[in-house]
Amino acid sequence: MRKFTAFACGTGAGLAAFYLQRLRDPKQTAWVHNSWTNSERPVDSWALWDSNWDCRDPKSLVRPQKNEQPQEQNRYNSDFEKNHAKSARHIILIRHGEYLDVGDTDDTHHLTERGREQAKFTGQRLHDLGIKWDKVIASTMVRAQETADIILNEIDYDKAKVTNCAYLREGAPIPPQPPVGHWKPEASQFFRDGARIEAAFRRYFHRAYPDQTKESYTLIVGHGNVIRYFVCRALQFPPEAWLRISINHASITWLTISPSGNVSIKYLGDSGFMPVKHLTNRIPRDAKNVV
């Protein structure tokens, strides 16, 4: 009888606590229910995909129909087709190889021997993928330039056609969440670098132009912070989350922008094609002026 009484009391207390919680916070119960069982109704409005994130959704570029007359419908449909993307864009992002942070200027920040080998492995990997490149773009910083040069020795692309872009230089894109104690740039650096890196994102990340008739492949050689920020922005994740991601030196990140504007990620920091001894993501311990 004592065991039965204890069991009944325990069950009753549990049920009472459950219903009391429901009475106190019914919204929280609905939140849990929706988050696990109803994918069509996101809990947070931030989870909704913005289909016009690049301001190139044809619906936003075409003058709306004035009426339902056939002539007006034909005009709208014709304008819509002229502004509608028809092919996908593949953007492949490569982080530079390992380098030494020696000296106070970028001119002295050269790749280590291992960094050069990493870049060669990446170039060979890209060659093996058999991609026909439409564009190759590189940050103007020395370590990215050296990485791009080594990669270009391995792939089929004319070095004279490479675009060098200062917008892609390394920097502090946005204050990260959660904050970290070992890396705290001044607010002025975020103010300066953030606008530039966001401008780079808007320059290179968008759906294909309407006159593009086949899938395109763009190779961008850049930096860890910039690439991680690009990934968060492209996938419409909170951009403040960029520092939660880690990518290795000379790794491959592959994003695809479909004609509809949807974005998917194929690789994130892929470096599995390298020997284990070549897997690095930080400046070597023997570097000077480590930041």
Swiss-Prot record:
Polar residues biased stretches: 67-77
GO biological process: positive regulation of mitochondrial fission; protein dephosphorylation
Keywords: Hydrolase, Membrane, Mitochondrion, Mitochondrion outer membrane, Transmembrane, Transmembrane helix
Gene3D superfamilies: Phosphoglycerate mutase-like
InterPro entries listed in its UniProt record: His_Pase_superF_clade-1, His_PPase_superfam, Mito_Ser/Thr_phosphatase
Catalytic activity of the protein: O-phospho-L-seryl-[protein] + H2O = L-seryl-[protein] + phosphate; O-phospho-L-threonyl-[protein] + H2O = L-threonyl-[protein] + phosphate
Enzyme Commission no: 3.1.3.16
Bilayer disposition of the protein: Single-pass membrane protein
Major subcellular site: mitochondrion
A GO term for molecular function: protein serine/threonine phosphatase activity
CC terms in the record's Gene Ontology section: mitochondrial outer membrane
Broad enzyme group: hydrolase
Localisation: Mitochondrion outer membrane
Short name of one Pfam family: His_Phos_1
Transmembrane segments: 7-23
Annotated region described as Disordered, given as residue ranges: 59-78
Domain of life: Eukaryota
Sequence similarity: Belongs to the phosphoglycerate mutase family. BPG-dependent PGAM subfamily.
Task of the protein: Displays phosphatase activity for serine/threonine residues, and dephosphorylates and activates Pk92B kinase. Has apparently no phosphoglycerate mutase activity.
Oligomeric form and interacting partners: Interacts with Pk92B/ASK1.
Annotated protein name in UniProt: Serine/threonine-protein phosphatase Pgam5, mitochondrial
